[in-house]
Amino acid sequence: MGLHFTLLLAALANCLCPARLCIICDPFVVAAIKTLEQNYLPTHLAPEHHEDVMKRVEQEVRNFADLPLNQNTFLGVVDEDTLEQASWSFLKDLKRITDSDVKGELFVKELFWMLRLQKDIFATLVARFQKEVYCPNQCGTMSQTLIWCNKCEKQMHFCRKSMDCGERQIEVHRLEDMVLDCQLSWHHASEGLTDYSFYRVWGNSSETLMSKGKEPYLTKTMVGPEDAGNYRCELDTVNAGPATIIYYHVTVLPPRSVEEKPPPNIVTQEEEETPVQVIVPTLEPEPEPEPIPTVTHRPEKKLKSRLLILLILGFVVLVASVIASVLHFRKTRVKSKNSNVENKTSAAEFKSEAESPQKMGSRKLSQAEFHTDSSDKVEEADN
């Protein structure tokens, strides 16, 4: 069983590459196939069916070579993003089979169905790569890092097309800003680009460098008649030769005319001489209504009025809260005074009650002394 499936893996490795099925270039796919051989197949497929299954799988794998090789479908190369998408789809379906724990004939059917499906998915991804990603430049030279499926190697590919990207007609009014744009849609995807250089081209074919840098724009403020003429932009690369060359023919137009209109509060002589006409509404369709003077409310005035109302309401609430606080304070103060008076009255009453027995005793003592004195005086008189 191990030998048969090893041969099957060899067939996969040998047949997928000539058929330019690039998923075999992904190390994760190779690891998944190895895991399938060592862990899944020994317990899910009977040994007597290995030879027949292997032949059928080899035939199915050879069918990957049916991909048409032409400029519009497949050239035997892909980019890294397309390879990742194809590998992810293959690994997802293979994991689905192993997670389902299918065995025997059902496993074989699932495996064949997965191989056919992955062939169609890979063909779709490659066709999209050929149409949208592979050499999208219409002019100039573009550099791309691509993967050659027959070798599983990354190499730099140069999409060489006409270096002349045409001439652009630029019209700008005097005293306005002139902007020359040298950026193309494929520049961000190209590799090995350096600086944008803008030149002024004179009549004797000589050139003057105006700017050089990473910015793809040349801006000239307040242009005049002397700025009219021919310009050239060149995008340099790390290799020999530019990636893009664009020419510009600049025409400086006269300044824009500004129509002067009288202010609305000044009445012209024509308006004074013209009698006021009263527009009478008619039954004709879409009559012109008589202009009615309306008071236009500016947003600033509305905002100021709203803020003023909010301030007034806030001030009223503040005054009301202050008045309520003062009344509450006075009320609590009166209550405290009343409680103090009551406390003092009760203390005075208690003191008077305490002093009353002492006063009674003193009164009795004074009366006794009075009687004693009076008796002594009577005795002295008798003597």
From Swiss-Prot:
List residues modified as Phosphothreonine. Answer: T372
Those parts of the protein on the Extracellular side are 22-306
Keywords on this record? Cell membrane, Cytoplasmic vesicle, Disulfide bond, Fertilization, Glycoprotein, Immunoglobulin domain, Membrane, Phosphoprotein, Signal, Transmembrane, Transmembrane helix
* Residues the record lists as Phosphoserine modifications: S339, S346, S366
Where do Polar residues bias regions lie?
Answer: 337-346
Q: In which tissues is it expressed?
A: Expressed in sperm (at protein level).
Q: Where in the chain are disulfide-linked cysteines found?
A: C22-C149, C25-C152, C135-C159, C139-C165, C182-C233
Residue ranges occupied by any Ig-like C2-type domain in the UniProt entry: 167-251
Describe its PTM? N-glycosylated. Glycosylation is not essential for fusion and for proper protein trafficking in sperm. Phosphorylated. The cytoplasmic C-terminus is phosphorylated and undergoes phosphorylation changes during epididymal transit.
Note what the entry says on domains: The extracellular domain assumes a distinct boomerang shape when not bound to IZUMO1R/JUNO. Interaction with IZUMO1R/JUNO triggers a conformation change, so that the IZUMO1 extracellular domain assumes an upright conformation. The cytoplasmic C-terminus region is not essential for fertilization. It is however required for protein stability.
Other notes on this protein? Izumo is the name of a Japanese shrine to marriage.
Protein known as: Izumo sperm-egg fusion protein 1
